[in-house]
Amino acid sequence: MVTIRLARHGAKKRPFYQVVVTDSRNARNGRFIERVGFFNPLASGAEEETRLDLARVAHWVGLGATVSDRVAALIKAANKAA
């Protein structure tokens, strides 16, 4: 099953997440099909907190991809801001 979820990157105590489309059987930070955005929970000042390619997210959801809870909240916030 294809899912859209967060893959953790960054340094210790400084998380940075990539929003990726992947097979649900792959490891959290493992192989992915496509990167559709990022989420920086520690963004401050002029730094960008979230960037999502909503067209690609809609494409994958249309093909039957499931969305994790956290990514669903990010999509909702991005739609509200746009």
Swiss-Prot record:
<keyword id="KW-0689">Ribosomal protein</keyword>
<dbReference type="GO" id="GO:0005737">
    <property type="term" value="C:cytoplasm"/>
</dbReference>
<dbReference type="InterPro" id="IPR020592">
    <property type="entry name" value="Ribosomal_bS16_CS"/>
</dbReference>
<dbReference type="InterPro" id="IPR023803">
    <property type="entry name" value="Ribosomal_bS16_dom_sf"/>
</dbReference>
<dbReference type="GO" id="GO:0003735">
    <property type="term" value="F:structural constituent of ribosome"/>
</dbReference>
<dbReference type="GO" id="GO:0015935">
    <property type="term" value="C:small ribosomal subunit"/>
</dbReference>
<dbReference type="InterPro" id="IPR000307">
    <property type="entry name" value="Ribosomal_bS16"/>
</dbReference>
<comment type="similarity">
    <text>Belongs to the bacterial ribosomal protein bS16 family.</text>
</comment>
<dbReference type="GO" id="GO:0006412">
    <property type="term" value="P:translation"/>
</dbReference>
<protein>
    <recommendedName>
        <fullName>Small ribosomal subunit protein bS16</fullName>
    </recommendedName>
</protein>
<dbReference type="Pfam" id="PF00886">
    <property type="entry name" value="Ribosomal_S16"/>
</dbReference>
<keyword id="KW-0687">Ribonucleoprotein</keyword>
